[in-house]
C-alpha cells in the first residue's frame, strides 16, 4: 500500500513513453495487450493523436494466447500489417500481460524481422514503470540499432525489399508542425548538426511546444540530425553518430546520449534551451519573495529552470523533486526523489513558508493548495486537463 495514491491519478506508463518516442518515426507499433493499454495511450497520453494518427495497433491479445503462449497469431498479424503499410521499422511494445506471462517480446521482434526483412525492435516495457523509462529504452534501442550505420545496409526479407524500395520513392512524412523534419531524404546541410534527445509530449505537452523547441535550437545556427521533437527516419538516427553534440532535454534522452558519447564520441549537453523552457524567470516575480522554491517536474526540465532562475538573480533556496527518474549527476544537496504522495505532504509540513512550481494537480495535496505556486502542467501527471 506504500504506493497508494489518494490525491493524484496514475502517471503515464512506460509503454506510453515508448510509443511517444516512436511517434515521429515511420514505424509500425504493435502494443501487446488486449486493447486497454492502447486505448489509454491514444486517448489520454498522446496529445498528437487528435491531429495526426500513426500506425499504432493493439495486438488484441486473448486470454488463451497469453496463457498458452501462442505467439504465432501475433507474428502473423504483424507481418500482415507490415506487408500492407511497408514501414521503415517495426516495434513490438510490451505491457503488463506479456510481462507477467513471460512473453519473449524481443524474440517475437526477431522472428518478425527474419520473416519481413524490416528492422524490428522488441521493447520490454511492463506497464509497472513510468513513461520516461519506456522512452529511454526505445531511444537506446534505436541508437544501438541504427546509429553509425546506413539504412541501405538493413537486411531484406520476403517483402522487406519491396518495403524499402516503396519508401525510397516517397517524400518524408509531414512533421508535427506541417513541415518536414525527417532528414533522411533531405539535401546535405552546410550547418553543423546536433541531436535533440528526450523531447516527448509527456514532458513538453503540445505539438507547438515541440515545434518551438526545434526552432530555438536552430536559432543557434545548427541543423538537426536526430530530433525526437519532430519526424525522423533510420537515416537520421544513423547520422546521430556524426553530430556535433547531443542536446538532452529530458531524463528520457540521457541514456541514449551517453551511448552515443561512449560509442561515437558525440559530446552531450544536458538542459532545455532557455527560450523553450515551460516557464521564464519573470513568471516567478513576486512568487518566491525569499521563500524556498520547490520545482516538481522532469528532472532535466526542472534543473534547467532552476539554472535560469539563478542566472536571473533569484537568491532563494531552489530545490528540484520528481516523481520520475532522477540522475545522480544532476542532483544537488536539497533535491529529492518523490517516493509517493507522503513525500510531498511531509515536505509541506516541514517547510511552512515554501512556494512551488509544478502540475496544477499538486494543489490537491495537503499543504500545497494554500501555498504560493506557479502552474507547470505536466502531461505525464495530468494528461490533457490543463493543456
Residue ranges: model-predicted function:
Residues 1-387:
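An N-terminal assembly and electron-transfer interface module characteristic of large anaerobic redox
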Amino acid at each position: 500500500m506504500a504506493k497508494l495514491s489518494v490525491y493524484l491519478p496514475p502517471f503515464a506508463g512506460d509503454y506510453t513513453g515508448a510509443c511517444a518516442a516512436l511517434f515521429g518515426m515511420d514505424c509500425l507499433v504493435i502494443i501487446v495487450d488486449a486493447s486497454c493499454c492502447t486505448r489509454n495511450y491514444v486517448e489520454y497520453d498522446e496529445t498528437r493523436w487528435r491531429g495526426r494518427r500513426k500506425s499504432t495497433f493493439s495486438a488484441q491479445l486473448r486470454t488463451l494466447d497469453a496463457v498458452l503462449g501462442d505467439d504465432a497469431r501475433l507474428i502473423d498479424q504483424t507481418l500482415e500489417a507490415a506487408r500492407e503499410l511497408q514501414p521503415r521499422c517495426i516495434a513490438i511494445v510490451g505491457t503488463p500481460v506479456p510481462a507477467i506471462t513471460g512473453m519473449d517480446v524481443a524474440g517475437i521482434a526477431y522472428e518478425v524481422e527474419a520473416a519481413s526483412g524490416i528492422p524490428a525492435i522488441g521493447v520490454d516495457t511492463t506497464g509497472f514503470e513510468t513513461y520516461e523509462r519506456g522512452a529511454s529504452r526505445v531511444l537506446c534501442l534505436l541508437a544501438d540499432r541504427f546509429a553509425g550505420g546506413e539504412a541501405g545496409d538493413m537486411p531484406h526479407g520476403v517483402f522487406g525489399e519491396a518495403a524499402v524500395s516503396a519508401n525510397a520513392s516517397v517524400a518524408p512524412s509531414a512533421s508535427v508542425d506541417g513541415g518536414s523534419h525527417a532528414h533522411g531524404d533531405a539535401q546535405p546541410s552546410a550547418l553543423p548538426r546536433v541531436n535533440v534527445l528526450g523531447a516527448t509530449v509527456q514532458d513538453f505537452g503540445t505539438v507547438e511546444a515541440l515545434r518551438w523547441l526545434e526552432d530555438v535550437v536552430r536559432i543557434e545556427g545548427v541543423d538537426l540530425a536526430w530530433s525526437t521533437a519532430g519526424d525522423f527516419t533510420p537515416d537520421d538516427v544513423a547520422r546521430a553518430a556524426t553530430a556535433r553534440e547531443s542536446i538532452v532535454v529530458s531524463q528520457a534522452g540521457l541514456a541514449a546520449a551517453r551511448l552515443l558519447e561512449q560509442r561515437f564520441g558525440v559530446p552531450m549537453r544536458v538542459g532545455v534551451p532557455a527560450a523553450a523552457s515551460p516557464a521564464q524567470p519573470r513568471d516567478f516575480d513576486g512568487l518566491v519573495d525569499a521563500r524556498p522554491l520547490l520545482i516538481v517536474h522532469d528532472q532535466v526540465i526542472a534543473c534547467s529552470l532552476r539554472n535560469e532562475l539563478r542566472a536571473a538573480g533569484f537568491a532563494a533556496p531552489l530545490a528540484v523533486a520528481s516523481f520520475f527518474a532522477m540522475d545522480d549527476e544532476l542532483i544537488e544537496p536539497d533535491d529529492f526523489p518523490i517516493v509517493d504522495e507522503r513525500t510531498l505532504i511531509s515536505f509541506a509540513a516541514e517547510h511552512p513558508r515554501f512556494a512551488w512550481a509544478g502540475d496544477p494537480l499538486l494543489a490537491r495535496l495537503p499543504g500545497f493548495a494554500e501555498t504560493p505556486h506557479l502552474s507547470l502542467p505536466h502531461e505525464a501527471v495530468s494528461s490533457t486537463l490543463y493543456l
